[in-house]
From Swiss-Prot:
Family matches, as PANTHER family: SOX TRANSCRIPTION FACTOR (PTHR10270), TRANSCRIPTION FACTOR SOX-14 (PTHR10270:SF107)
One Pfam family this sequence matches: HMG_box
Subcellular location: Nucleus
GO cellular component, one term: transcription regulator complex
Protein name: Transcription factor SOX-14
Molecular function GO labels: chromatin binding; DNA-binding transcription activator activity, RNA polymerase II-specific; RNA polymerase II cis-regulatory region sequence-specific DNA binding; sequence-specific DNA binding
Gene from which the chain derives: SOX14
């Protein structure tokens, strides 16, 4: 960038007066050293100088400043403005997507201050939520009594065989996975294992003694079938 012909340089300060000769000397001693590294070293050396060593350069800087004011009485320092960075222009590097009018509170046309009152009152906020088709219901902790908790603990959380993709293909309907099936059509609810505040409907019967057996993994080798294999007797024979 070319400077205008009428550009007036600033008067040198004490450090610039001292570093003018030192920079030339250091550049001759280290021709491959970058100019920024030279400036860094000169600044460190200038800080190590005592006030008595800096005094001649301070006086020279004052003389140059007075001379500069005489030559340019209307001089005013105007720093060059750096071009604005394009990244700073966009404050959000990853802008949030616009969700449109899908927000129930926004679609209802509520004022800005009304959302605070809705957050403090869950009953009012629940009225703006869209209806859901999920068969789960939120239970209030005050509704749980000792008898209700005992009844819910007696009801197991079982999995249907259809939810296990490998159970039917391996043919273990009557094995460990078969004990997890729901043969009865009696509908009841039990607490969700992931969220105790929800109940999940299930067509399951109560736990039986056979369903408490842990699942056993079978490893079938060529020429072997799963019939006739007793895992407990095999494990006992191996341990012996």
């Amino acid at each position: 960038m070319s400077k205008p012909s009428d550009h007036i340089k600033r008067p040198m300060n004490a450090f610039m007066v001292w570093s003018r000769g030192q920079r030339r000397k250091m550049a001759q001693e280290n021709p491959k050293m970058h100019n920024s590294e030279i400036s860094k070293r000169l600044g460190a050396e200038w800080k190590l100088l005592s006030e008595a060593e800096k005094r001649p350069y301070i006086d020279e800087a004052k003389r140059l400043r007075a001379q500069h004011m005489k030559e340019h009485p209307d001089y005013k320092y105007r720093p060059r403005r750096k071009p604005k960075n394009l990244l700073k222009k966009d404050r959000y590097v990853f802008p949030l997507p616009y969700l449109g009018e899908t927000d129930p509170l926004k679609a209802a046309g509520l004022p800005v201050g009304a959302t605070d009152s809705l957050l403090s009152s869950p009953e009012k906020a629940r009225a703006f939520l869209p209806p859901t088709s999920a068969p789960y219901s939120l239970l209030d902790p005050s509704q749980f009594s000792s008898s209700a908790i005992q009844k819910m603990t007696e009801v197991p959380h079982t999995l249907a065989t259809g939810t296990l993709p490998y159970a039917s293909t391996l043919g273990y309907q009557n094995g460990a996975f078969g004990s997890l099936s729901c043969p009865s059509q009696h509908t009841h609810t039990h607490p969700s294992p992931t969220n105790p505040g929800y109940v999940v409907p299930c067509n399951c019967t109560a736990w039986s003694a056979s369903s408490l057996q842990p699942p056993v993994a079978y490893i079938l080798f060529p020429g072997m079938t799963k019939t006739g294999i007793d895992p407990y007797s095999s494990a006992h024979a191996t341990a012996m």
